[in-house]
Amino acid sequence: MSVSDSETPAYGAAQPAQPRRKTRIPHLRQMKADGERWAMLTAYDYSSARLFEEAGIPVLLVGDSAANVVYGYDTTVPITVDELIPLVRGVVRGAPHALVVADLPFGTYEGSAQQALAAATRFMKEGGAHAVKLEGGERVAEQIALLTAAGIPVMAHIGFTPQSVNTLGGFRVQGRGDGAEQLIADAIAVQEAGAFSVVMEMVPAELAGQVTRKLTIPTIGIGAGPDCDAQVLVWQDMAGYTSGKTAKFVKRFGDIGDQLRAAAAAYAAEVREGTFPGPEHSF
């Protein structure tokens, strides 16, 4: 039985009908208790989010890393709430069973807990996000507490915090030497404030493992060794979509960039040669 033209979407493929459990925060807690590790990826649009859900990724982060990989900024600092909200909408639609977390951009939460609440509320109401992420440890505990009390789940982010790249003096490992005590204090502070999980970025593996064992909430590593409860990567780095040098903690699991470049070149060549579209692609 063939599908009629009216039933075939003009662009992209139809959404597959695959019943799947909606990922919720209690599931992540249970996975930690059971010693079951899980993967998180960034996502910035409907199509990639759909693929990641089909691949079994339970948590998707609409990260402020969109500043780099979507908008082409040099750092994450310039991106705004208005630039991120449309991306969140697409991801939520593309991955209806994933837990979708939205990053609070630089300058939208540091000033006060009320400022954080205003920004987070926009992501929940206008974007459809299920949770928000913000950077910082003890210094943002008040913000985390207010958001949690208001019914907004919070994923914390400690260690290297990209929004503070100018203060930190570049991309540097955090938590070495005397910094270990502060990182542990930050981890405990965000847990006590009500965060449901915490990202640890560019932290020595041994220290990250120590924090993971100390906390009752899941830890998510990026450049923090193998002992975290979960791992996260920017999807373009993970899939080999970006070119050039990547961070030490990145492993490329594909070569999407080369494949896409080759596909685009082949398409352009067939158009120039007049071989596309052929009879099979014409009405």
From Swiss-Prot:
**Localisation:** Cytoplasm
Positions binding 3-methyl-2-oxobutanoate in this chain are 64-65, 103, 133
A cellular component term, taken from the record's GO annotations: cytoplasm
One of its Pfam families is Pantoate_transf
Pathway given in the UniProt record: Cofactor biosynthesis; (R)-pantothenate biosynthesis; (R)-pantoate from 3-methyl-2-oxobutanoate: step 1/2
Per the record, the major location class is cytoplasm
Q: Where is the active site?
A: 201 (proton acceptor)
Which E.C. number(s) belong to this protein?
2.1.2.11
Q: What class of enzyme is it?
A: transferase
Chain positions covered by the region annotation Disordered = 1-24
Cysteine disulfide links: none
**Reactions catalysed:** 3-methyl-2-oxobutanoate + (6R)-5,10-methylene-5,6,7,8-tetrahydrofolate + H2O = 2-dehydropantoate + (6S)-5,6,7,8-tetrahydrofolate
Alphabetic keyword roster? Cytoplasm, Magnesium, Metal-binding, Pantothenate biosynthesis, Transferase
Output the Gene Ontology terms for molecular function.
3-methyl-2-oxobutanoate hydroxymethyltransferase activity; magnesium ion binding
Quote the function comment for this protein: Catalyzes the reversible reaction in which hydroxymethyl group from 5,10-methylenetetrahydrofolate is transferred onto alpha-ketoisovalerate to form ketopantoate.
The protein's assembly and partners? Homodecamer; pentamer of dimers.
* Name the record gives this protein: 3-methyl-2-oxobutanoate hydroxymethyltransferase
Report the source organism.
Nocardia farcinica (strain IFM 10152)
